[in-house]
């Protein structure tokens, strides 16, 4: 299923609103879990991973009203490591969380281009608008200007172009003539010449609708006798290559893209915990069930079985609780 098509929300959601919800006893449970010596981590998992984000915000308000403390700050002081990072991520409203991830990717020395590419290439125009608004409110600067200050060259251009969210302007009508012309232009900008006209690739990949791009990719393969992905790999490199390939993958199948991100976050030595946490938290109320199905089809194992192999302790238990039962 391509990324711009809607799916039945309940099909995709692993974390749903708790029925018969009352924030006051939940806030009290959390207070008791962190009161005195030691912390009852399982009680924290049971409450926060089984409530929707909206309900968590209500619990935080009740916690403040009853006990005069900020819930997120209290959690930070009681927890540590990857488990703390995951639980704190759950407490952010969705767009503020993604704004924070983008801000963290750019602050300090070095830039985590992969995080920026992942978020900008996979969100809809409305989601990007909300993220930009949250970013400006929380950090007092423009996301677009910060990206321009922190990146350069063609990578900067593709990221700024993605921020406009033009691929989300979808109509069911695709002009076959324009799709063929775009495919010919891509071929002329890469395989046909020595060197590459990167701006032609960026313009077509970032400003055409997703439905249109699918037709372009089909026409391109007929002209070039190779896939658009293979051409991008041979014509570009580094972060620009990663950005272009991400646009193609998200256009073709968003759920497969996230399944791949989760798989490679855990495959091999070490775990990319930031990628694992961000994608499970941010997709849990959107389409994580659908991502789980694609994960199993693509890799022959379930997402939860890989989490069990690759993580441990309270961190593992919280992730498994968010992911829910196997497809």
UniProtKB/Swiss-Prot annotation:
The keyword Transmembrane helix does not apply. Belongs to the annexin family. One of its GO terms (cellular component) is collagen-containing extracellular matrix. Keywords: Annexin, Blood coagulation, Calcium, Calcium/phospholipid-binding, Hemostasis, Metal-binding, Repeat. GO terms for biological process: blood coagulation; endosomal transport; endosome organization. Pfam families: Annexin. SUPFAM superfamilies: Annexin. The gene is ANXA8. One of its GO terms (molecular function) is actin filament binding. A pair of annexin repeats may form one binding site for calcium and phospholipid. This is Annexin A8. Annexin repeats lie at residues 21-92, 93-164, 177-249, 253-324. Ca(2+) binds at residues 266, 268, 270, 310. The keyword Transmembrane helix does not apply. Gene3D superfamilies: Annexin (1.10.220.10). InterPro entries: Annexin, Annexin_repeat, Annexin_repeat_CS, Annexin_sf, ANX8. This protein is an anticoagulant protein that acts as an indirect inhibitor of the thromboplastin-specific complex, which is involved in the blood coagulation cascade.
């Amino acid at each position: 299923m391509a990324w711009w098509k809607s799916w039945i929300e309940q099909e995709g959601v692993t974390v749903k609103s708790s029925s018969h919800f009352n924030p006051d006893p939940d806030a009290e449970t959390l207070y008791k879990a962190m009161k005195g010596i030691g912390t009852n981590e399982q009680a924290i998992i049971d409450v926060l991973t089984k409530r929707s984000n909206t309900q968590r915000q209500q619990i935080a308000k009740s916690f403040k009203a009853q006990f005069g403390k900020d819930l997120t700050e209290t959690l930070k002081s009681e927890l540590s490591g990857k488990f703390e990072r995951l639980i704190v991520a759950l407490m952010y409203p969705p767009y503020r969380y993604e704004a924070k991830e983008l801000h963290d990717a750019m602050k300090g020395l070095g830039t985590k281009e992969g995080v920026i590419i992942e978020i900008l290439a996979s969100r809809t125009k409305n989601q990007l608008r909300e993220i930009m608004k949250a970013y400006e409110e929380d950090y007092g600067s423009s996301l677009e200007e910060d990206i321009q200050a922190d990146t350069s060259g063609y990578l900067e251009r593709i990221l700024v172009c993605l921020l406009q969210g033009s691929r989300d302007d979808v109509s069911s009508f695709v002009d076959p003539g324009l799709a063929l012309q775009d495919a010919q232009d891509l071929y002329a900008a890469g395989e046909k010449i020595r060197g590459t006209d990167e701006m032609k690739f960026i313009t077509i990949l970032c400003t055409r609708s997703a439905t249109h791009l699918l037709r372009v990719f089909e026409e391109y393969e007929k002209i070039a006798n190779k896939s658009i992905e293979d051409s991008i790999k041979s014509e570009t490199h580094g972060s620009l290559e990663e950005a272009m390939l991400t646009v193609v993958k998200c256009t073709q199948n968003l759920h497969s893209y996230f399944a791949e991100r989760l798989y490679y976050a855990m495959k091999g030595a070490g775990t990319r915990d930031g990628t694992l946490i961000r994608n499970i938290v941010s997709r849990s109320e959107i389409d994580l069930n659908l991502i789980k199905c694609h994960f199993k089809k693509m890799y022959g194992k379930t997402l939860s079985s890989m989490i069990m192999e690759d993580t441990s302790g309270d961190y593992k238990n919280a992730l498994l609780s968010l992911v829910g039962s196997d497809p």
